[in-house]
Amino acid sequence: MIKFKQISYNVTSLERDNSDIKFIIIHDTGNRSKGANAEMHYRYFNSGNRNASADFFVDDKQILQINNYNKHYSWAVGDGKGNYGITNKNSVSVEMCIASDIDYNKMLNNTVQLVKELMKKLNIP
């Protein structure tokens, strides 16, 4: 189940429908610190300007959506000012939490389930 908590920073308002979204971007957080789960990343990104954001954070226990991607786009893609075709405006972003105390295989399975759901919902092959 996806839990939703909208962040207040580092998103840009843009009304778009699902057909505007062509790509799903998957990163890991790069944060191996103990306790660096989805909730902790939400709190970090919702506490001030980070010059970055994402749409989803996934750990071994939950999938946390922190941005309504139909109303805002997140700042997750280094898009080369549009030169490469994949932009923040035409993608949604998924961040995998890789903290040292997270069950990596469960987190990976949760990520796969989320991406499958997004592919179906957004009609992305």
Predicted features, each with a name:
Residues M1-P125:
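Active-site-adjacent loop/helix surface patches within enzyme catalytic domains
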